[in-house]
Regions:
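Acidic/polar-rich alpha-helix caps and helix-coil junctions
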Residues: 1-77, 87-89, 99-275
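Extracytoplasmic segments of membrane-associated envelope/inner-membrane machinery
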Residues: 95-96
Length: 275
């Protein structure tokens, strides 16, 4: 943890607090870090995810299998994308996300999606329409065990997207141009022949790119909630039995998780969240 990682995390915190001036100022500082951190290039993008402390990594937890109990132990993001999740169909990529990414067949981020290595061993839920795809963003350092994959807490791509969102919300010609430049740094990295035009810049477009770029990193739900947007869960191979979309709005009581019963028992003044 260093000054750059703290400033990067603060850019996220202030974005969540809707303090866009501070979020943008801190994001700019991190982006102008003197070359210590750099965005992945288009060509290296498919191969960087299992490595320690990549050029984008501002803060990550280090894991190794060379020491006793040195792996993740199933905690954090890496484990949920392992081959041994087989019938955990709540952990596969949603059809809605793959349809979104499929809008551009040449997007380099397709390289991080794969079918199971042994589909004949996968257990498909009743009514599923084909094998699900897993996210291969956490392949492990040797490529065969995700439990030694480091967990990246924040990386430079997110900082660029934080800056894009904060600058857009602040408005004004200079901020809008900067927002577009930050957004296109991510869009054109994914596909060098693609870019967002000035007339296409919107909060919806920025959030769409956040969803594509930061998939599997724990942002999409909170991005929707903090912007007053609903999340729609539709059927597919992960929820084949859902006939109608399950919509969760920011005011939905399910947004606040239940307080553990042990905490309720220990404090008679504790009021349980509605759920």
């Amino acid at each position: 943890l260093n000054v750059w990682s703290v400033k990067a995390l603060l850019s996220r915190v202030y974005l969540y607090m809707n303090d866009n001036e501070k979020a943008l100022a801190l994001a700019k500082e991190v982006m102008n870090n003197g070359g210590l951190y750099q965005l992945f290039t288009h060509d290296e993008y498919p191969t960087v995810w299992g490595k320690d402390f990549s050029s984008e990594s501002l803060f990550e937890f280090y894991y190794t299998l060379s020491e006793p109990d040195g792996g993740t132990g199933g905690e954090g993001a890496p484990m949920v994308y392992a081959d041994n999740v087989k019938d955990w169909n709540n952990l596969v990529l949603t059809k809605a996300f793959l349809d979104l990414l499929g809008e551009d067949p040449d997007d380099v981020r397709h390289s991080l999606n794969r079918l199971p290595e042994k589909p004949e061993e996968d257990i498909l839920p009743e009514g599923s329409k084909g094998y699900p795809k897993y996210l291969n963003k956490y392949p492990g350092k040797t490529g065969d065990n995700p439990q030694d994959n480091d967990i990246c807490i924040i990386r430079l791509s997110e900082v660029y997207l934080n800056a894009a969102e904060a600058a857009f919300k602040l408005g004004g010609a200079e901020n809008l141009k900067f927002s577009l430049d930050c957004l296109n740094a991510i869009v054109s990295r994914a596909n060098p022949v693609k870019s967002v035009k000035e007339t296409e810049l919107s909060l919806e477009r920025i959030l769409k790119e956040r969803r594509k770029e930061l998939v599997g990193e724990g942002h999409a739900f909170f991005d929707a909630m903090r912007n007053g947007l609903s999340v729609s869960r539709t059927g597919g191979w992960h929820l084949p039995s859902v006939a109608a979309a399950v919509v969760i709005s920011p005011s939905d009581p399910r947004v606040a998780l239940p307080i553990p019963q042990a905490e309720i028992d220990a404090n008679p003044n504790m009021v349980q969240n509605p759920h």
